[in-house]
Structure formats: C-alpha cells, structure tokens
C-alpha cells in the first residue's frame, strides 16, 4: 500500500529504485585517507567500514563526512563520525546513511559511536 503521512510528519527524501533510460556515469570518490585518520596501525575492520561508507549515496556525491578511530575504552573500540559542511544541506542525513554503510562494512566488531 501507499504510506500516508501523519499530522506533523514530513518527507525527508525520496529513494528511486529501478533502471534509467540511459546508463549512469561513474563519479570520483574520495579516498580512505581523505575522510578518516586511518594509518597502517588502524584495525582493518575500520578501514573496511570507511571503504563501505565511501560507496554510500550522498547528496550530489559530495561525501561530506569523516570517520575517526578514537581507540579502546573499557574493552570496546570507539569510532567518531562527523558531518561536513555543505551549501545544499542534507549532511545529517548523508552522515546517517554513511554510518550505516560503515557498520555493514566493518562487520561484527564490538565498537561504539562516540
């Protein structure tokens, strides 16, 4: 069925699913180093999470987010995600989508967002 907006609700975005009339074109994506503090010492799951986040859809492909591996605290890895600045908005929504992709890419690792 069709979703009905309740009073006080508003549509934040639309997601189009299907095939276009023409083939889409690829676009450049940022590197892990451009959007994170990953080094040779950073856990591989963190890098995989960032790589997955870089594949997440963002408003006009801006990728205005960053991830920081903070370290360990109380036996848990800590990761910080930040939204960047954008003239067109949507960075908070983009950050949520990127964080989800990070979680999928990182796998079953015991970490927490800080």
Question: Model-derived features: where do they sit?
Answer:
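Acidic, surface-exposed loops and disordered segments
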Residues: 1-114
């Amino acid at each position: 069925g069709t979703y009905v907006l309740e009073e006080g609700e508003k549509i934040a975005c639309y997601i189009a699913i299907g095939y276009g009339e023409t083939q889409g074109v690829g676009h450049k994506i940022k590197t892990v180093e451009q959007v994170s503090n990953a080094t040779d010492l950073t856990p591989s799951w963190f890098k995989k999470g960032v790589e997955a986040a870089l594949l997440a859809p963002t408003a006009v492909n801006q990728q205005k987010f960053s991830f920081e591996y903070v370290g360990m605290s109380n036996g848990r890895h800590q990761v910080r995600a930040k939204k960047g600045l954008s003239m067109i908005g949507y960075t908070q929504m983009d950050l949520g989508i990127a964080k989800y992709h990070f979680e999928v890419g990182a796998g079953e690792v015991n970490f927490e967002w800080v």
